[in-house]
């Protein structure tokens, strides 16, 4: 009884507004550039939760009701405050927007890709928000319009492409669009002979694949409450009828449908929702197959989920290829006869090698090509049908990204390459190398550059990229990919980016406009270096790198970031008061949590659509990604894991006694991954827990668009310019870019880390 009485007194104190509550509830005036500005603070509606004898109060849970007019009023007030608080940066923001928009590459930044008798390609007419899709016969002739997103009602506000999949004969086009930003894609099938849309599926659709008959389409449909695909639907376009042919009942599993690179087989993968290690070729717990020319047939299970392995299947001649993790986390490659691919018939093709991850399998008629990664360096290795190693392609970059094949670029579009060929197209991209598309002929081991993104005004020789190592608390070496101008003065300001979640590898990439590096050139030109810290929890160094920082080891992600920052300062690359950390989504949660542990180490924090409250996400059964988050962070229903989460959860570590660095937070009203009220609650609670330090806190919420941000140029440039102007202001780096000032040759260096 005594314990209950004490707990009740704590609850009464929190609800009634005793001393503890008063300390957190007073609204403060942020000392920014205009001291008369006062940020908004929504009303508090305290709700008590008692879990594992821990009493917490959620004062701003009511913000989740987006239909409440007070919610929108508060969000609009935050946007207004953000504009006023950064009013002194308007000229800088305008300058940055002009720089970013001026780097839009010329046409032809991506080569066309072939499907059947046609080459498909994009054309971007200036003045229109979205590129238009065309096609031209492979044999030559005039181009014809296939898809103009600018003509879709609502696309002028927001438009995101999900899939773009033409049938092999060129009759039909399956494409999907998101016109809100919530990542729920509507499927449409267009008859390209007359331009009519002959089918629509308003449900949330993912992958699509055509059967060999060119009128049967298979696609995945999403489970509404879990945001994962659980159904495979077969559509007969000619008849206009559809039926569910496979449904996964286990909500911890999802399904995916695809076609083998040979074109002969369809594969149905059953995936664990917690496995996000690769967006391109994810391992499956179970695999089914169906001949592509028998779309009405019965699917055959070739990998049993009872095996407990992760497997990716491909087809090559009379055998199936399996990338499997049975021998270790870096994968090995085996083959098996099509009629009996059971494990007893597996024959090893490539053994498991510690430290060498087999990321992807690609097959040509006479060549097997593997995309491997050792450390941060990817490579392509070919083998002929007898298993002899042929070409080995290793880009001359310290760390970079290789993408194999060509696709339409939609989030569910599959990259493709011709099977009956000895040539394979791939792209290389890094901090200093814009996307460069290369065709390699494995018959004669020769390469030719097809095209490269030409960024106006960009001179790659002015920048230098490198990789340095930092020693973590436990002695592990953590890599940091860095880029800076060659003539940058060291030490200097640095923007460090981090993700560190779900085993997703984040490697340097330039990407074509509009993208992060084309925008970040404006930072580099103002002598702010940029880097990615490859902390544990990510997948850059393979699955063990991820597994080392999950659940009750998750704080290793944060301590790795701290060690990397300290290492750059000790090496004389970064100034002690000149490091800004940034992260997006799960990475946003990473930087917010890390700032709790070492607030004085960082000049400022940028948290885009951050996972700011892990505990409440896990406890809310209506949240779409709860199961995935549990596998990564732990289950707060377990007392031990709850206490561990409580030790670093950004929201629950806000207090009046803790000062935090200046922070920029953004969110999106229609975000389907990190629901807007997570960042909003964090900001409101942090404002209410102001300390004497009064750290500057800016919060912007996009009323249009979702997790990935605006969908076309002006919005993307404005968002990037606002964020970078804020970062430059925190670093006091208002210096103009080098085109407007003389640079001393005496400052030139060959190594950005001295």
Swiss-Prot record:
The keyword Hydrolase applies. Belongs to the peptidase S9A family. The keyword ATP-binding does not apply. It comes from Sinorhizobium fredii (strain NBRC 101917 / NGR234). It is an enzyme of class 3 (hydrolase). InterPro entries: AB_hydrolase_fold, Pept_S9A_N, Peptidase_S9_cat, Peptidase_S9A, Serine_Peptidase_S9A. This is Uncharacterized peptidase y4qF. Residues 733-754 are annotated as: Disordered. It comes from the Bacteria. Pfam families: Peptidase_S9 (PF00326), Peptidase_S9_N (PF02897). Keywords: Hydrolase, Plasmid, Protease, Serine protease. One of its GO terms (molecular function) is serine-type endopeptidase activity. The active site is at 585 (charge relay system), 707 (charge relay system). One of its GO terms (biological process) is proteolysis. Its EC number is 3.4.21.-.
């Amino acid at each position: 009884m005594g314990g209950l009485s004490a707990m009740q007194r704590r609850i009464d104190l929190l609800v009634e507004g005793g001393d503890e509550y008063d300390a957190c509830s007073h609204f403060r005036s942020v000392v920014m550039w205009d001291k008369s500005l006062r940020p908004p603070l929504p009303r508090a509606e305290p709700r008590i939760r008692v879990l594992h004898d821990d009493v917490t109060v959620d004062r701003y849970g009511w913000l989740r009701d987006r239909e409440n007019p007070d919610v929108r009023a508060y969000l609009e007030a935050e946007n207004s405050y953000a504009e006023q608080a950064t009013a002194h940066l308007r000229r800088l923001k305008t300058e940055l927007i002009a720089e970013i928009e001026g780097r839009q590459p010329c046409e032809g930044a991506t080569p066309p890709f072939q499907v059947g008798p046609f080459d498909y390609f994009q054309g971007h007419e200036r003045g229109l928000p979205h590129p238009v899709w065309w096609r031209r016969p492979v044999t030559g002739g005039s181009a014809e319009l296939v898809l103009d997103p600018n003509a879709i009602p609502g696309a002028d506000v927001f438009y995101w492409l999900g899939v773009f999949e033409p049938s092999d004969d060129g009759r039909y086009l399956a494409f999907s669009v998101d016109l809100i930003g919530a990542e729920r894609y509507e499927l449409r099938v267009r008859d390209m002979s007359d331009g009519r849309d002959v089918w629509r599926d308003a449900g949330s659709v993912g992958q699509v694949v055509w059967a060999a008959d060119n009128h049967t389409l298979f696609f995945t449909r999403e489970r509404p409450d879990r945001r994962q695909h659980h159904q495979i639907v077969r559509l007969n376009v000619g008849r206009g009828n559809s039926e569910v042919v496979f449904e996964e009942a286990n909500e911890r599993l999802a399904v995916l449908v695809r076609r083998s690179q040979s074109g002969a087989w369809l594969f149905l993968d059953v995936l664990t929702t917690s496995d996000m290690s690769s967006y391109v070729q994810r391992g499956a717990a179970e695999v089914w197959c169906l001949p592509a020319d028998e779309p009405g047939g019965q699917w055959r299970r070739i990998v049993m989920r009872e095996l407990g392995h992760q497997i990716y299947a491909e087809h090559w001649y009379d055998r199936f290829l399996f990338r499997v993790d049975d021998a270790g986390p870096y994968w090995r490659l085996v083959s098996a006869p099509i009629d009996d691919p059971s494990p007893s018939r597996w024959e090893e093709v490539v053994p498991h090698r510690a430290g060498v991850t087999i990321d992807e399998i690609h097959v040509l008629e006479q060549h097997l090509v593997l995309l491997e990664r050792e450390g941060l360096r990817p490579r392509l290795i070919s083998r002929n049908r007898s298993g002899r190693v042929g070409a080995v392609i290793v880009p001359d970059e310290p760390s970079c990204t290789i993408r194999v094949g060509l696709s339409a670029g939609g989030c569910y579009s599959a990259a493709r390459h011709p099977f009956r060929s000895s040539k394979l197209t791939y792209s290389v991209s890094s901090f200093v190398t814009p996307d460069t598309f290369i065709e390699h002929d494995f018959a004669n081991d020769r390469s030719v550059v097809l095209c490269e993104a030409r960024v106006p005004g960009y001179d790659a020789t002015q920048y230098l990229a490198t990789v340095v190592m930092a020693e973590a608390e436990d002695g592990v070496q953590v890599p940091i990919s860095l880029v800076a101008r060659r003539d940058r003065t060291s030490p200097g300001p640095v923007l460090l980016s981090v993700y560190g979640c779900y085993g997703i590898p984040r490697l340097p990439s330039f990407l074509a406009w509009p993208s992060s590096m084309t925008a970040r050139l404006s930072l580099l030109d103002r002598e702010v270096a940029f880097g990615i810290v490859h902390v544990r929890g990510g997948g850059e160094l393979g699955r063990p790198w991820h597994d080392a920082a999950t659940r009750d080891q998750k704080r290793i992600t944060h301590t790795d970031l701290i060690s990397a920052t300290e290492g750059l300062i000790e090496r004389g690359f970064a100034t002690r008061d000149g490091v800004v950390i940034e992260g997006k989504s799960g990475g946003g949660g990473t930087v917010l949590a890390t700032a709790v542990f070492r607030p004085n180490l960082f000049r400022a924090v940028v948290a885009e659509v951050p996972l700011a409250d892990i505990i409440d996400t896990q406890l809310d059964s209506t949240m779409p990604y709860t199961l995935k988050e549990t596998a990564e962070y732990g289950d707060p229903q377990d007392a031990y894991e709850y206490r561990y989460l409580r030790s670093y959860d950004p929201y629950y570590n806000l207090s009046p006694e803790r000062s935090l660095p200046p922070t920029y937070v953004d969110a999106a009203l229609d975000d389907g991954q990190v629901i807007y009220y997570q960042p909003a609650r964090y900001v409101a609670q942090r404002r209410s827990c102001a300390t004497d330090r009064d750290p500057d806190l800016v919060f912007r919420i996009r009323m249009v668009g979702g997790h990935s941000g605006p969908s076309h140029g002006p919005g993307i440039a404005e968002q990037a310019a606002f964020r970078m102007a804020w970062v430059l202001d925190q670093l006091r780096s208002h210096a103009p870019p080098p085109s407007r000032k003389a640079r001393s040759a005496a400052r030139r260096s060959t190594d950005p880390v001295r």
